[in-house]
Amino acid sequence: MLEERFSAGGFSARLCRCNTAVVGTGAAGYNAADRLWQLGQRDILIVTENRLAGTSRNTGSDKQTYYKLTLSGPEGDSVREMAETLFSGQCVDGDIALCEAALSAQSFLKLVELGVPFPRNRYGEYIGYKTDHDPRRRATSVGPYTSRQMTECLEQAVQAKGIPMLDHLQVIRILSDGHTAYGLLCLDTAAREETDRFVLIQCKNIVYATGGPAGMYADSVYPAGHYGATGLALEAGVKGKNLTEWQYGLASVKPRWNVSGTYMQVLPRVYSAAEDGSDEREFLMDFFKTPAEMLSKLFLKGYQWPFDVRKVAGGSSIIDVLVYLERCKGRRVYLDYRRNPVGGAFSYDELEPEARDYLTRAGACFGTPVERLGHMNAPAVEFYRDKGVDLARDPLEISLCAQHNNGGLAIDCWWQTNVAGLFAVGEASASHGVYRPGGTALNAGQVGSTRAAQYIAAKRGGAPEEGFEPAAAQALEQMGALARRTLQPQGNVRALWAQAARRMSECGAAIRDGGAIAVYLAEVKAQLASFERNVTASEAAELRWVYRLRDMLISQYAYLAAMLDYMQQGGKSRGSALYTDPAGKKPYAQLPDAFTFVLDDGSRGGRVQEMLYRDGACVFEWRPVRPIPKDDDFFENVWREYRETGNVG
């Protein structure tokens, strides 16, 4: 890595040069850097806003799942069968599904070799269990912190190799002409002097491992400190794909954590209260006829954690809806593990068979919810205690939260975007569709970063592309001028951020009304047009929020436009999104009219929505999914090609 200075328009920046810049220090980013080094590419630089932040290191659940090819037991499995499982999630490209299946075992076993303690039996089989949307038993876990342990082991591998890292650098512009990437402009959030404020990175390749656009939503289970940077990639000319497809689910507010699995299966008391904590009510019983019916649905919510519009009528997702509606009334909703629901006036024998049999086999038909939780999953209790929440003493506030973006930046089967040299890996990339088995995101992050590294090492070595200087000069002048204009005695950027995130949660999350989306879309467009005039920061330390807000608004604009386009093309409710449709039906008469909807019939599952953000407008294209490839697998042919090219490209 070479370092010097670059000046333009009265602004100066440090300049670093390298072949490949890896943006992000989650599991996907670290794996990309580690794989590049293993493959012989040593001119690498890792760039991160905060090494200890991010979703991989700071998120999880009661039993965080990693999805892999079956490596135990008598049941048959194959790369092709796993690819078909992934492909069946709708709006999934088959070549990507095949890659995620083909490299699954390799990626998983690398993590094992690095020290991630995935459980195996005495004979060496890596045992598994069945997760949602999983026809086999491909899921495995090391407990609540699977992705954290992955990240820490990969980080140790990277540090052992001495791969350089620049911490406290926030990417604020991707240097691109819409066809080729030339580098990055970053804000040094630790700089004390204006002359040290900006850092330019000239590189031939960018591995973009920035995670999903978490900052768009106020109601979010993404860890505090993770914001994403999808908007910057869209601005640079990268296509978005499946932007409408998300996962939302119930999560605690402080700390941010999925309340899935045993958190629901132990049947906590669910109640709401006024803002000041008064007027407690077990509001679910206003809807359900009997405690047994309510508790059976609550139990299933543990198994079926993501909000699924197919499970609103007669299923467990009615719990998500009722929590959402209660919060819309201005009330706060809590899980209470101290006391049994309905004053204990229920019988385990009256629960639906799945709930009754599970709790009986677990020996958990006794005591209070926290006692049941301690019996069934003691680490789940310890997690909250470590965060300052004692479930034996404190209620847990929850909300319906954004959890994962199945869509994102469009990629090919090497995880390269339509902008040459820009690779998107991890949640930043759009490798998933409407539905996916639990844990596939962790597998996809490892596979995608491996594929990107393989392509870069084989095809994109050498010096950076020509064209950097004009792109860098323009970006430095524009972003430098923005900093000077926004620094004012009174700052409003934090308030604008909070307002925008709240509006997105109100109209662009799990419950989507076309009219409300159109109204907020126009507001976002106006905010972007007046951004330089209306956004202010009271001190240099707030500039990070200025650039963050800019990225967030671009993301919101693109995602809202995608939702509106989906509806205009006749799209119906599917996955984790309920689209209000007056032509539909309400599953329950007592629900508000906003819950009148039509279920998608799956006929659009073979088409993908792609979007190009150009000159402040979104251009949409719908195309057929790419099928699962059926390549020649005759050994001698593959072997010959492998000897000649490594079968890369």
PLM features per residue range, with description:
Residues 49-84, 247-251, 257-266:
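Conserved N-terminal glycine-rich FAD pyrophosphate-binding loop of Rossmann-like flavoproteins
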Residues 107-194, 202, 209, 252-263, ...:
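Conserved redox-cofactor binding core of oxidoreductases
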Residues 21-23, 200-211, 233, 423-424:
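Short hydrophobic core segments
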Residues 205-258, 439-455:
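Glycine-rich loop(s) and the adjacent beta-strand/alpha-helix scaffold that form part
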Residues 1-19, 32-35, 51-59, 110, ...:
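Glycine- and aromatic-enriched mobile tails/lids
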Residues 239-382, 455:
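An anion/pyrophosphate-binding glycine-rich loop and adjacent beta-alpha core
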Residues 15-18, 194-205, 418:
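Core beta-strand elements of the Rossmann-like FAD/NAD(P) dinucleotide-binding domain
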Residues 18-46:
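N-terminal Rossmann-like FAD-binding beta1-loop-alpha1 element of flavoenzymes
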